[in-house]
């Protein structure tokens, strides 16, 4: 399912000990479920046509840690299969049917990945608060089995706009994989589960509800 709140939510208040010792920073950290891939067949995949074809599948399975948390609600994963036509520097991406708006100020993105020990690298693609596309992370996929990949959102990706009343935060666009030319032959398989965001909901919680949004 898309964009559901996970169970773990907590508000944290920390004190910045400045000269007066009375500067407080408040955070309301939430683990936000972007997609659990129970409807993975609604996703799409793409790659340059002259390098090969990529297809996706919804199939049963998942990392043991995730399945153990709720077997009835965590039955399916997203799988992608690439069939290369020739070697080179191709890429492929998997994307949801539409961008997913993540509420609040996103601290990090994470996803469980089942790798096949290829030298490929993975990034998240997002829109910033102004709709500008951005790539986040450059994570190695040279491992076997399931691994939870977590990427911090850098400060240079704009998530707040205080000169108008707009929806704050970023939107998730998809997962992008750059293929190492040494591995761009034959077939390649990769699987994903439990796409999450760790987000600070403080700004959303304390936004004035009667202030209209500048989204028209």
From Swiss-Prot:
Annotated region described as Disordered, given as residue ranges: 1-22
Compartments, as annotated in UniProt: Periplasmic flagellum; Periplasm
UniProt-listed GO biological process terms: bacterial-type flagellum-dependent cell motility
Listed Low complexity bias regions: 8-22
Keywords of the record: Bacterial flagellum, Periplasm
Superkingdom per UniProt: Bacteria
UniProt biotechnology annotation: Has shown promise in a 4-component vaccine with BHWA1_00430 (AC C0QY54), SecA (AC C0QZS7) and BHWA1_00569 (AC C0QYX7).
Matching InterPro entries: FlaA
GO annotation, cellular component aspect: outer membrane-bounded periplasmic space; periplasmic flagellum
Disulfide bonds: none
Function: Might be part of the flagella.
Protein name as annotated: Putative flagellar filament outer layer-like protein
């Amino acid at each position: 399912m898309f964009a559901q709140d996970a169970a773990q939510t907590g508000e944290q208040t920390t004190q910045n000990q400045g000269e007066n010792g009375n500067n407080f920073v408040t955070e309301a950290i939430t683990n936000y479920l972007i997609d659990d891939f129970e409807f993975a067949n609604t996703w799409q995949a793409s790659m340059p046509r002259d390098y090969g074809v990529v297809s996706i599948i919804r199939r049963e399975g998942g990392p043991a840690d995730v399945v153990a948390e709720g077997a009835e609600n965590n039955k399916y994963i997203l799988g992608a299969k690439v069939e290369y036509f020739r070697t080179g520097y191709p890429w492929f991406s998997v994307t949801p049917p539409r961008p997913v708006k993540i509420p609040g100020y996103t601290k990090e993105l994470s996803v469980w990945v089942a790798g096949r020990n290829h030298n490929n690298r993975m990034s998240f693609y997002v829109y910033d608060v102004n709709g500008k596309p951005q790539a986040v992370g450059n994570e190695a996929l040279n491992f076997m089995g399931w691994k939870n990949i977590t990427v911090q959102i850098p400060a240079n990706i704009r998530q707040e706009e205080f000169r108008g009343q707009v929806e704050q935060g970023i939107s998730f666009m998809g997962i992008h994989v750059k293929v190492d030319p040494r591995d761009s032959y034959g077939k390649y398989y990769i699987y994903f589960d439990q796409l999450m965001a760790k987000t600070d909901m403080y700004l959303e919680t304390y936004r004035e509800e009667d202030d209209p949004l500048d989204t028209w």
